[in-house]
Design a protein with these regions (language model features):
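12-transmembrane solute porter fold
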Residues: 1-172
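Short, intrinsically disordered terminal tails adjacent to the first/last structured region
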Residues: 174-183
Length: 183
């Protein structure tokens, strides 16, 4: 969320793009999530969430770093492919990670697990917005600082996701859910 909050300010303040251009430049990210997440969801049946999540976060980290290091006066295409890379990475992280969290809960607690997932997501979005506001307060090229912070956080999260491989449950693909007949 830190990156997604700071990017419109980056496009307008640093790159001097109009509001319409900024809106269009934001579009490749969610489009790539829409492409990457279903693919990652299918792969999650045979590849562990730790591997997919770590790979997705590495791709997101690289995309954010490339956005923070854009050339002077970049073209829309130079921005768009970096945004798409971020979205693809985010989609590859989000789908298997959500599946892993929800499938780890007992069936009777699936509603609570969904609630916790939503709470964690909202907490992350809030912290991201706070970090963006703090970076804007710093001054200078604060939008670039925010993108750098987002890339660093994605790198840390990639390491944490990869560390799940060393946990017995994280080293193998999740088992398919078995729904028992109610008595």
């Amino acid at each position: 969320m830190l990156a997604f909050v700071s990017l419109p300010f980056f496009f307008e303040s640093v790159l001097h793009r109009s509001q319409v251009e900024t809106g269009l430049l934001m579009t490749p990210w969610p489009l790539a999530v829409g492409i990457g997440a279903p693919i990652a969801g299918r792969l999650a049946d045979s590849v562990s969430a730790a591997v997919l999540g770590a790979a997705g976060l590495v791709v997101l980290c690289v995309g954010l770093a490339l956005l923070a290091d854009l050339p002077e006066n970049p073209t829309a295409a130079e921005i768009a492919w970096r945004m798409a890379l971020c979205g693809l990475g985010f989609g590859f992280f989000q789908a298997p990670n959500n599946r892993s969290m929800l499938s780890a809960a007992p069936l009777a607690r699936s509603g609570a697990a969904g609630g916790m997932l939503a709470t964690a997501r909202l907490t992350g979005q809030t912290i991201g917005a706070i970090l963006a506001a703090i970076s804007f307060r710093i001054g200078g090229h604060s939008e670039t600082v925010a993108l750098g912070m987002a890339a660093a956080l994605a790198a840390i999260a990639a390491v944490a996701s990869g560390a799940r491989l060393y946990h017995p449950a994280g080293a193998r693909p999740p088992k398919p859910a078995i729904v028992a007949d109610a008595p």
